[in-house]
């Protein structure tokens, strides 16, 4: 088997060298319509790994990426005076046998953060991959909140490009009376 990061022979999806490189991320953030969205990698650094989300090995790749980044963030994250926070994936529909955004939300689980599965659904089946900002604006995701919120929310996705999905999800949660603390993704497509 070959490492999906560098192509070297290894018995895992990612070799030890690639794991070391990916675990030395710098947490950055981007402001989207007043919402701070944290990310771990530039899209250009992990685009080949993210493209596996529609393949059989994708669930393993996303779990490995999350162990190296999101889970480590969750281990050290604590917000005083907030007993519970929900991690909500943007449209965690099962595609290709699993939901990549649900894997990311699950990686955030700690004593304070609890994933809330199947809470936010895109009512539109539009695909944004490779589409322009104009196309995205004309074809909204039309998110719908399917579960009542009992705690503040962290919005979760794999990539942030224009920020429209995060903005639309934030508006959906807020219109239902929920509070969005921030968003978190693996990669920023602008880098």
Indicate where each model-derived feature is located.
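Short cysteine-rich clusters marking metal-coordination/redox-active sites
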Residues: 3-6, 15-18
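Cys/His-rich microdomains that often coordinate metals
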Residues: 10-11, 22
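Active-site-facing substrate-recognition patch
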Residues: 16-84, 94-95, 119-149, 187-191
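Glycine-rich phosphate-binding loops at beta-strand->alpha-helix junctions
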Residues: 89-101
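Short helix-loop-beta junction
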Residues: 106-114
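Residue-level marker for buried hydrophobic side chains located in beta-strands
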Residues: 154-155
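Activation segment
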Residues: 161-162
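PRPP-dependent phosphoribosyltransferase catalytic core
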Residues: 167-191
